Structures are given as C-alpha cells and as structure tokens.
C-alpha cells in the first residue's frame, strides 16, 4: 500500500471519528445513559442528577430508579420518592409510575392508596399501560366496592396492549366477575388479544376452552393443541401440564409416555404441583423412565409440598410401605386437609380411631 493511500485512509478515519463524535449525545442525560448501560452507576447517578437539576425529567426518573433498586448505592426509598415526585410534576409518565408504586407499597413513605391512585392516574393519562393496570388492581383488590373503576382501568391497559389487562377482562367476562354481565363472546375476544400479546395464561385458557368445547366454542383439538403449545412455550405451567396429560392418555394424540414425561417435567419445574406428582407416578411405574422409587418419592414430595393432594396421598403410601408410620400419618393428615377423602380415611385407620 502506498504512503499516499495510507494517508487518505487515516484522514478518512479521522474525519469519520470526528463526525461520529459530533453525533454522539454529550448532554448530561446522554453521558448518564451511556454510563448506566456500561454499569458505571456512580457516574450515571452524577450525570442524571445534573440532568435533573437542569430540568430534564428523565434524569430525575432515572435517579429514582437507581435509589429504589440500590444500583451502585444503598437502597434509599425516600430519595427515590423525592426524585420520582419531581419527575412526575414535570409530566414524566415513568416518574409518575415509580411514585405510584412507592405509595402503593408503602416504601419510603406511609402506604397511601389515594396518593398511589393520583400518581398512577396521571401516568395512565400519559398512556403508561402498567399504571392503568395497577389502578385496576387497586380498585379490584385493595379498595373494595369499585368494580366498575377496576374494569375501566383494566380496559384502558388492554387498549394500550397490556396483555395482563386483557387477560383479567377475559376471566371477568368468562366467570361474570367484577360485576360484569357474563359473556363467553367477550371472554374469548379478550383472551385472543392477550394471547396474541404473548400472555401464557390467556393462551392456556383458550386451549382449555377449545379442548373442552366451553364458552360456546366448538370442541377443536387442533386449535386447542396450538394454544396449549404456545402457552407452554411462554412458560405457562398449566399449558405444559395439559400437553403432558394429552400424551400420557393418548387423548387426541398418539400416546407417547416420553413426551408426556418431558412436558410434566417442564411444568413441574415451573411450579405445577400435579405435574410433579405425575412424574412421581411415572418413576414408581417405570413408565418412559427407569423405575426409581427414590425419584418417585422425591417428586411426590415436590407435588405434595406445592399442595397436590394426590401427591400427598401417594407419598404417604410410600412411607407406610417403608414402615415409617410417623411420616405416613403426617402426610396423610396434609392430604386430608387438602380435601382428599381417602387420605382422611387412611389417617383415621393409622391413628386407630
């Protein structure tokens, strides 16, 4: 390469870098954001504070987030509250959302639902979906007698594509909750939107409705399977558990114990109690997996600990067969309290009365 060409390349790079430097945001906020992304929270906080003092509301909000989460500093909810309040007063919707959250949970201040409502409402007007949803939660679960307000704000959150808001409305219309008139048609519409927005619970609900022909829908296995598969892919334990049951029983699909086991394992790991118990059964029978009573006991125990009465019943039976009467009584008692009649009967026999 000739010296002349090299000189041209070097000059070109110099001017390119100069151009990029001119394009780089070197405002207080820009410097703060780059520092924050790189994990230099101390520098980020310093520049967010400068931005905030300059009247840039986003800088105030980001300071609130840093103090609320203890990023590069100790958690300080009072300072977070102060910065969120400043941001919210400047119509920063994220600042209002953060402020509402602290009042809602009573962090850095006394819990105050009215203050939370005021902050969330301002953010909701500024089109912050989660704030609208949180207003729905407050009116639904925390301040009783406001079902109409809850529906209004769940609807607003759904309109802003907040999947969970759509799902909650689906449940309300399917079950007739929140004082709405029960409507299968509306329930399905809301579930469909929530599922399109990747809400696993909504996809699972649709799968169950199509599988059983409920809510005025025709039974359609193929559609049900697709929705359950999507639910499972979105880490919904119920969707995975339902697929496991289909393959275990050969319902609508070719019976495949190995696939059933895999889905049950996936569901169990996500917290499905009944799926853990079903894995216990498969280990006890050597179905799709080598027979292993230790693993059977462990999985029945997982299911029982998570509240599956069948898992408790099976676990107690294993302890009884192992001549461990004390544990058998304790677990039958738990199964009985969970509502399993046979566990109550066995408990009575073991206690001798």
Can you describe what each PLM-predicted range is?
Residues 17-42, 46-47:
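N-terminal leader/linker segments that initiate helical-solenoid repeat arrays
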Residues 28-35, 62-69, 98-105, 134-141, ...:
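Hydrophobic face of amphipathic alpha-helices that form TPR/SEL1-like repeat modules
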Residues 334-353:
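Terminal, low-structured helical/coil segments at or just beyond the last alpha-helical repeat
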Residues 38, 74, 110, 142-144, ...:
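Structural motif corresponding to the intra-repeat A-B loop/turn of tetratricopeptide repeats
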Residues 35-36, 53-56, 69-71, 89-92, ...:
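Short helix-capping/linker turns of helical repeat alpha-solenoids
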């Amino acid at each position: 390469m000739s010296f002349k060409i090299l000189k041209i390349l070097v000059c070109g790079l110099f001017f390119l870098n100069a151009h990029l430097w001119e394009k780089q945001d070197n405002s207080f906020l820009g410097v703060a954001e780059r520092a924050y992304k790189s994990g230099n929270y101390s520098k980020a906080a310093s520049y967010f504070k400068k931005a905030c003092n300059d009247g840039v509301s986003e800088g105030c909000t980001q300071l609130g987030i840093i103090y609320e989460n203890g990023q590069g500093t100790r958690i300080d909810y009072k300072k977070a509250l102060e910065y969120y309040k400043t941001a919210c007063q400047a119509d920063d919707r994220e600042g209002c959302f953060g402020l509402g959250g602290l009042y809602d949970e009573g962090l850095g201040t006394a819990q105050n639902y009215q203050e939370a409502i005021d902050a969330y409402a301002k953010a909701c007007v500024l089109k912050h979906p989660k704030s609208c949803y949180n207003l729905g939660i407050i009116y639904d679960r925390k301040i009783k007698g406001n079902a109409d307000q809850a529906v209004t704000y769940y609807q607003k959150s759904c309109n802003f594509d907040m999947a969970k808001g759509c799902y909650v409305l689906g449940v309300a219309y399917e079950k007739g909750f929140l004082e709405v008139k029960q409507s299968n048609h509306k329930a399905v519409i809301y579930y469909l939107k929530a599922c399109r927005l990747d809400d696993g619970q909504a996809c699972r609900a649709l799968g169950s409705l199509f599988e059983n022909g409920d809510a005025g829908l025709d039974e359609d296995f193929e559609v049900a399977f697709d929705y359950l598969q999507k639910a499972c892919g979105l880490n919904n334990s119920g969707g995975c558990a339902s697929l496991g049951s289909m393959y275990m029983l050969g319902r609508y699909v070719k019976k495949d114990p190995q696939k059933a086991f895999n889905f049950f394992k996936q569901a169990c790991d996500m917290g499905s109690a009944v799926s853990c118990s079903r894995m216990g059964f498969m280990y006890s029978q050597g179905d799709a997996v080598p027979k292993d009573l230790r693993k059977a006991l462990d999985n029945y125990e997982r299911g029982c600990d998570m509240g599956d009465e069948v898992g408790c019943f099976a676990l107690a039976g294993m302890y009884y067969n192992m001549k461990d009467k004390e544990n058998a009584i304790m677990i039958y008692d738990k199964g009985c309290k969970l509502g399993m009649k046979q566990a109550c009967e066995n408990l009575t026999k073991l206690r001798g009365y």
